[in-house]
């Protein structure tokens, strides 16, 4: 009997996780299958308990369930997920314990390291102050980066920066509005876009244009549909190094796979599968 894994979210039809994980299971000869399930926030606890009762191997959670999951009595979050305030990976223990993790930040960290970015001591601008920005900023601050969070609503950026600073992490974290981004970027090593600007169908939007950027910059857009966003095109035109959002998707998925199975996943195959599915 196949062991079932899955991703819960709403909407969920667009998810690339089933293709990615099923390719990994198949390559490793594991008798497992991964499905996408549409689950609304108010039904999340019942859905997780039902999955545990039916012997699911593990779960991913996506929008809009990550923050909801942290508040559920049935989930025991690990310290990082608790600090971030969101769970994206659920692991079912043999004794009935349900653990919650957040692999988004680790995925972003690995994507940057893959691009030869030295995170410790780097000056990193994170655009956006939502769940993804929170996970990424926490992880990179914990690894010693100097973080500036910029957001259209300045107060949200400032509040997030205070939250991260209060967690007594190593990096220096500040928050500010989007105005003045161009000047800020002149003394920045990495720009990370966590906003939906540039995402399909609004593919002509971007948080920055080529004249705002410079050749010494690494530009990382977590948006992966389209594969090359306008921001990444502008970055290439400026001579900056670019990092695709596909890498974060794959690396956070690979970390979830390790947590569920204890087995090293075929990361290159997972990446190839996602690229073919886009």
Where do the language-model regions lie?
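Rossmann-like adenosine-cofactor binding region
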Residues: 169-242
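NAD(P)-binding Rossmann-fold cofactor-contacting core
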Residues: 143-167
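Adenosine-phosphate binding glycine-rich loop
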Residues: 218, 222-278
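Phosphate/diphosphate ligand-binding glycine-rich loop within oxidoreductases
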Residues: 2-117
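Conserved S-adenosyl-L-methionine
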Residues: 142-146, 238-241
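Glycine-rich adenosine-cofactor-binding loop
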Residues: 9, 102-105, 112, 117, ...
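Short glycine-rich anion-binding loops that position phosphate/pyrophosphate groups of nucleotides
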Residues: 57, 62-68, 131, 196-199, ...
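Conserved beta-strand positions in the Rossmann-like core of class I SAM-dependent methyltransferases
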Residues: 35, 148, 243
């Amino acid at each position: 009997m196949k062991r079932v894994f899955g991703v819960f979210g709403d909407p969920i039809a667009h998810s690339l996780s089933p293709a990615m994980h099923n390719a990994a299971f198949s390559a490793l000869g594991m008798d497992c299958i991964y499905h996408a399930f549409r689950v609304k926030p108010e039904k999340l606890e019942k859905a997780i308990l039902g999955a545990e009762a039916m012997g699911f191997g593990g779960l991913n959670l996506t929008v809009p369930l990550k923050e909801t999951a942290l508040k559920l009595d049935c989930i025991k979050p690990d310290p990082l997920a608790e600090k971030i305030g969101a769970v994206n990976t659920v692991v079912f223990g043999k004794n009935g314990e349900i653990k919650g993790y957040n692999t988004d930040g680790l995925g972003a960290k690995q994507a940057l390291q893959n691009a030869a970015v030295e995170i410790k001591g780097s000056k990193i601008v994170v655009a956006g102050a939502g769940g993804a920005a929170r996970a990424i900023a926490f992880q990179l601050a914990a690894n010693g980066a100097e973080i500036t969070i910029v957001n259209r609503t300045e107060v949200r950026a400032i509040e997030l920066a205070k939250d991260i600073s209060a967690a007594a992490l190593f990096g220096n974290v500040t928050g500010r509005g989007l105005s003045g981004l161009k000047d800020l970027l002149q003394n920045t090593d990495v720009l990370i876009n966590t906003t939906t600007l540039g995402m399909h169908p609004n593919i002509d939007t971007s948080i920055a244009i080529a004249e705002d950027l410079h050749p010494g910059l690494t530009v990382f857009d977590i948006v992966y549909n389209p594969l090359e966003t306008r921001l990444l095109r502008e970055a290439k035109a400026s001579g900056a190094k670019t990092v695709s959002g596909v890498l974060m998707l794959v690396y956070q998925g690979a970390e979830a796979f390790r947590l569920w199975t204890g087995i090293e996943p075929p990361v290159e195959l997972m990446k190839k599968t996602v690229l073919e599915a886009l």
